[in-house]
Curated annotation (Swiss-Prot):
It catalyses: uridine(38/39/40) in tRNA = pseudouridine(38/39/40) in tRNA. The keyword Isomerase applies. NCBIfam families: hisT_truA. The lineage of its organism: Bacteria, Pseudomonadati, Pseudomonadota, Gammaproteobacteria, Enterobacterales. This is tRNA pseudouridine synthase A. The active site is at residue 57. The keyword Transmembrane helix does not apply. Signal peptide: none annotated. InterPro entries: PsdUridine_synth_cat_dom_sf, PsdUridine_synth_TruA, PsdUridine_synth_TruA_a/b_dom, PsdUridine_synth_TruA_C, TruA/RsuA/RluB/E/F_N. Formation of pseudouridine at positions 38, 39 and 40 in the anticodon stem and loop of transfer RNAs.
Length: 263
């Protein structure tokens, strides 16, 4: 009897992280990874293990998570998507699937990752946006925040924005894009880098929120130059953070699924 050949697949996943203990599987806890692996295993009729582009913390959301897995089972793309989604809660959804070459790796093949942080900026908190954004009651100076944030562009030692417990060997990262805009009561911060340190985005946002009309010029640059976590702002809530998009080389021809507005 001919042995079935393993095939590798990439999968695009969207999820609301409010109800899970982060991405990574943990014994006795409900996580995004464990839920997806259980659903995939049922459809594949064998144990499936997945690798993701970026492990998100408890409370962090995603519309752009990419994972890969291997399977000996044959299913159409439609059958994979509908089948897996039927075993997932409504807080997790598979958006696309594509067979990929053996050399594809969801984590190591990624060129860059983009995160979005959403702040509900109003004197009164929102019940609707409670788990989708971070509430800041003082009015934020978005123009000044944007100006200060530009000092983070390029390759730097981001030790000032690196939380304890970070397992990365190097504090150097390269931010290629950082944009901040206001949409009525929402302040939207988009950051793209080759990769991120532990809590790096949330610590950057925590520092930007400290900026006000009286903040002296080069506030963020001075924090960056200190290379000391004690000088940066607090780590902001996970509920405002989204893994927005993961970029891969064109040769893999992965679908691009990127919503501009994700509340």
């Amino acid at each position: 009897m001919k042995e079935k050949k393993n095939k590798k697949f990439a999968l695009g996943v969207e999820y609301d992280g409010s109800y899970y203990h982060g991405w990574q599987s943990q014994k006795g806890l409900s996580t995004i990874q464990s839920e997806i692996e259980k659903a995939l295993s049922k459809i594949a009729n064998h144990q499936v293990n997945v690798i993701c582009a970026g492990r998100t913390d408890s409370g962090v959301h995603s519309i752009g998570q990419v994972i890969h897995f291997t399977s000996i089972s044959f299913r159409s793309d439609f059958s994979w998507i509908v089948g897996v989604n039927s075993y997932l809660s409504k807080n997790i959804s598979v958006k696309w699937i594509k067979e990929v070459s053996e050399n594809f790796n969801a984590r190591y093949s990624a060129i860059s990752r983009s995160y979005r942080y959403i702040i509900y900026n109003h004197k009164c908190r929102s019940a609707i946006f409670r788990n989708r954004s971070n509430h800041v009651y003082k009015e934020l100076n978005v123009d000044k925040m944007y100006f200060e944030a530009q000092s983070l562009l390029g390759e730097h030692d981001f030790s000032s924005f690196r939380s304890s417990g970070c397992q990365s060997r190097s504090p150097f990262r390269t931010i290629t894009d950082l944009n901040i805009r206001r949409l009525k009561n929402l302040v939207i911060i988009d950051i793209t880098a080759n990769s991120f340190l532990y809590h790096m985005v949330r610590n950057i946002v925590g520092s930007l929120i400290q900026i006000n009309d009286n903040t002296k010029k080069n506030y963020i640059k001075k924090i960056l130059d200190k290379k000391d976590r004690n000088y940066a702002g607090p780590t902001v809530s996970a509920r405002g953070l989204y893994l927005f998009f993961v970029k891969y080389p064109m040769c893999f021809n992965l679908p691009i699924f990127k919503d501009d507005f994700i509340i």
